[in-house]
Amino acid sequence: MISYNQWLNNWRYFCRLCERFETCIHFVDDSVDNTGKLINGDTYSIEFCDILMSTSAEFENVTIQICKEIDPNFNDKSNIKALTKTITNKFPKIGETIISSPVQSFSPLRDWAESDEGTIKGIDWWGDHTDIKHQRYPNIKKASFQNCYNALSSLFVMELYASTFVTDGEPVLQISSSPCSYFSSEYLFDLIWPIPKKLPDFEEKDKNKEEL
């Protein structure tokens, strides 16, 4: 089981990554165009490279923790295909999870799935991080503002879902008292969201409880 202390360590690390990202906003404007993409999304740097690599590693770390909760025999050396299959089978509505930033509300994992060809779609930043990991300099342009934004918001979704294993279906309340500095969520209680919503995969469970 994911312990509270383990979850809190994950959450604090995520918040630290968000703080680093938010610091970059002082130098790179985070406005979006009419398609929802960051206008300066192609901007790249060593700092973005570090944030992307750290965020991707943490996404994998938290996702593995969730997979081991779903299946205690899950191999923690599994690749992204196995992670994707396990998560999306257990939580088919995870892609509906909405995350908010100062410039928009969106669903970062909306298209996350395994394609008919066996490739992973919907998290392009993951493939870019892999390219950087194996050959950083030729792929440094993939260490972009947009990839960091997408990776961090995707990690936020996984943090929310991981917290439900600590509290039996409810996001940990302490998230609200230790909020992320850049992203927010309608599934948490705070001044912006005074009445938090249920995570997409837990809405039906609550309806069933009410019927009982």
Name every feature range the model reports, one short phrase each.
Residues 162-212:
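Polyanionic, low-complexity intrinsically disordered segments
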Residues 28-31, 35, 94, 136-139, ...:
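Short secondary-structure junctions and interdomain/linker hinges
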Residues 132-163:
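Charge-enriched, short contiguous segments at helix-coil
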Residues 59-127, 133-138:
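Short non-catalytic regulatory patches outside canonical folded cores
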Residues 45-70, 149-159:
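Short, hydrophobic, well-ordered secondary-structure elements
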